[in-house]
Every structure is written in C-alpha cells, then in structure tokens.
Amino acid sequence: MTETKQTDAAAPRLTSLSHGGGCGCKIAPGVLSELLRRTAPPALFPDLLVGTETSDDAAVYRLNDEQAIVATTDFFMPIVDDPFDFGRIAATNALSDVYAMGGKPILALALVGMPINVLPHETIAAVLRGGEAVCADAGIPVAGGHSIDSVEPIYGLAALGVVHPARVKRNAAARAGDVLVLGKPLGVGVLSAALKKDRLDAQGYAQMIATTTKLNRPGTALAALPGVHALTDVTGFGLLGHTLELARGAGLTARVRYGALPWLAGVEALVADGVLTGASGRNWAAYGHDVRLGDGLPAVAQALLTDPQTSGGLLVACAPEAVDDVLACFRDDGFERAAAIGEMVDGAARVDVS
C-alpha cells in the first residue's frame, strides 16, 4: 500500500516537530504506575470484563451472553517523516489492541492534533488518508473523530471491536507449561532511532514500514483456539516489559530464549554502534529489577530486549499442544517469522532470559 509522494520542500520533517515518536512516546512504566496509584480505585461493574487491573490492552464490556465490546485508544507523535506512512503506522498500532484481546474491529474514530500553521494542509490530509487506508484494509470505517491545533503532531484512533465474552483473551491468564509465541520480529525502536539520525537506508526503512503496517489480524482467529490462554501485543515497554506483564498477571516466571528471538535485519549492529532510543533505558530502569539476564548474552541484549516496539507483534501464551496451530494461524496470514520464544514456569513473577 503506497501513495504517490507530493512533498512540500518547505515543509518541516514530521519527526523534527516532536520530542519522541511512536510507542517510544509512552510515559515510562514506573511513572505510569505511580500516577495510577494516585487515582481512585475503579468502581465495580459486573459487566466490565477487563478494566485497568492488569494493564491489559483494551477494555472489554459485556453486552449480553453472546457479545462484548472491545474499546481502546492509541495515539502518538511521528515515528517517520512520510505523512501517509505515519497515518498507516498509527492506525495499525491502534487496531492491534482490539486484536490482542481476541476481538474483531468494527469502527474507528480519528484522534488528530496538528500544528495547523506549521504543516501544509496536504501533509495533514495525507496522515488522515494513511489511517483511513489501514482501516479500509481492516474492513472498518473511520466514522468520525476529534481534532485540535497542537504544538506537536499527534495522530491515532479510538477503536471499537466485538468479541464473544467466552473468547476474551487477557494478558493475565497464562498457565505453567505454556509456550510463548511471538508474531513479529523485534527492533522497530532501533530502526526509528536510526531514521532520526539519518542512519537508516532504504532497505531498512522498507522493512520498518512493512512490519509496522501489518495488521495483527491473527488475534481474532487465535481467540477461537482453546489452547490459547493469554494474549497481548509488544509495544512501548519492549519485549521484556510486556512479557513481564504476562508473568505478573499469572504469578509465574517467563523464560525467554534469546537465540529464538526474531530480529529485524541490522538492528543488532546498529545498537552495537550506539543507535538506540531513550525509552529503552527508561524501560530497564522501571522493571529491570524483575528481569534476570543470563551469562553469555551479547552486550546489546539489554538494549534490544527493552527496545520500544511501535505496532509490534502479538505475544501468545498457549498450551504446548497448541503451538503448531498458533504458528499456522500466524503463517496463514503472512507472519512468516512468527516463532516460539520461551515458556511459562512456576516461580516468582519475573522474566529470565538465557
């Protein structure tokens, strides 16, 4: 999916207008936890199947015995300079949270903040067209939205989906013995940092766009597999952060095999050369005390494992006998690099990497 480039030579680079980009814009997990602790505990609503308790990907509200609504919102500042690609990435990332609950998207609303007197109107329109193109690919309308004049460019979606109440996939239901399966290769944050430093070649940019604009559609089909116990997506807190959420939610230890992890081409060399995001360090500071990195890992391991993923892959915890079906579900939708990367075992709520 491409759009003919009609760039305005006088227009500033989108990434030059923001202090962060993509899911690297997220408030650091430690700070976010502290902020939420200062708010009132949520009231009890019997039909609210998923709320804020386990930092899950979306809210789920039961309408009746056959239907529940999945509701989520996601927006961020530019991770790339091409406005159409920015819109596509942001929309793909927002819809991922619906898929991560096992849901099927049905509707989106656009969330738009733009420096209206700085960016050409055609640039802003291209962002909107990018988001609409992804929603069309997902089979849903962008049915409205809200816009403001802001200092930094911001775009995203509020998205609604549907799921059967019995098929909701939480991030807190993994079981001892489950195998962890990852849907997409890692390293988007590193590539985005390289882009901002003019260190990313055309091939690197192409692979970044390909992975960040690929809808996590398998989530809907995974919800129908009884052997799938827990589901989330890997975004701003990096692989370690979101795996740790699975471990904490289940009260188990997650074991990750570093050698089994799929990486985007070139990211290890870039990190070795000092190209990484500030969010990587903030992530480690927030949760590194609950992670054990084994001896013999490469020097770049910590930075890569905490690298913030924008529009990252689904992370599945499933019974061992369901692994082949889970991998087939991914590969039937073109996720050729989906891989089993570890397992859940009895033990303290932490992540061990070997």
From Swiss-Prot:
What species is given as this protein's source? Burkholderia pseudomallei (strain K96243)
The entry's ATP-binding residues are K26, T54, S55, D56, D74, D97, G145, H146, S147
What this protein is reported to do is described as: Synthesizes selenophosphate from selenide and ATP.
Question: What is written in the cofactor note of this entry?
Answer: Binds 1 Mg(2+) ion per monomer.
Gene3D superfamilies per UniProt? PurM-like C-terminal domain, PurM-like, N-terminal domain
Instruction: Spell out the catalytic residues.
Output: C23
* GO MF term list: ATP binding; magnesium ion binding; selenide, water dikinase activity
Can you cite an annotated GO cellular component? cytoplasm
This chain belongs to which protein, by name?
Selenide, water dikinase
SUPFAM superfamilies reported for this sequence? PurM C-terminal domain-like (SSF56042), PurM N-terminal domain-like (SSF55326)
User: Which NCBIfam families does this UniProt record tie to the protein?
Assistant: PRK00943.1, selD
Q: Which reaction does it catalyse?
A: hydrogenselenide + ATP + H2O = selenophosphate + AMP + phosphate + 2 H(+)
